[in-house]
């Protein structure tokens, strides 16, 4: 991969909407407030779905906000140059998003009571989703083949760095009372129970009919048709023809794309990198 994208502290970032100065300020100077709710993921791990769910929980299922405000405005990415300004201007309680690895996250979070919801996904599916997503985006060098992107991914030479380091970093926080770790697979398998778990974590009591509305308006089909959620409002300069954010929304799609050799090579590195974690910690081991 050619070096035409910005780097900060050893991590590659997209070519647009980022600067080392803002990333440094976010880490060192941004003040996280106790009332903040922050959704955090490695890219292509259910970020926008989780954001939709959280926004709908906070509105008790009322879809007005998610149908009238683009997702990057209602839950801005704090590390984006524009998103950072939006977060600073938000009224309390603030809701925002990040893909940042733990060591680049705002330092003030670690002495706050702010709530972080971290969603993990089978890295094989995150890889395949990332490949198709970045193949149609003008924010970093486009992979020519899945094999090429897999090599970049396993080397950590992709935007936001290594999946393994990202997940290991955030999993180290999983016993903290203000951090909730979820999996994309659980969201797919039992959406209602996972939504209820998020409600409990956020201290929000929803009536059954309100939970029904959250499930309805955060469903794949509703989000796919909602221009405030499906990224069709992105400037055309950022995307190429055929771009889609919500491609499949399924579990195990990697099996349709990995060769046997690729699956074996990935598994070898996965076992090395994730040694020491109990398999039951990861829902995809059961899928």
Swiss-Prot record:
Cystine residue pairs: none
* Reaction it catalyzes: an alcohol + 3'-phosphoadenylyl sulfate = an alkyl sulfate + adenosine 3',5'-bisphosphate + H(+)
Residues the record lists as binding substrate: 72, 77
Q: What does this protein do?
A: Sulfotransferase that utilizes 3'-phospho-5'-adenylyl sulfate (PAPS) as sulfonate donor to catalyze the sulfonation of 3-alpha-hydroxyl groups of neutral steroids.
Q: Which range is the signal sequence, renumbered to this chain?
A: none
Task: Kindly provide the name given to this protein in its UniProt entry.
Answer: 3-alpha-hydroxysteroid sulfotransferase
Keywords recorded for this protein, A-Z? Cytoplasm, Lipid metabolism, Steroid metabolism, Transferase
Q: Where in the cell is it found?
A: Cytoplasm
Extract the Pfam families matched here: Sulfotransfer_1
What subunit structure does UniProt give?
Homodimer.
Active site (catalytic residues): 99 (proton acceptor)
Tell me the name of the encoding gene. Answer: STD1
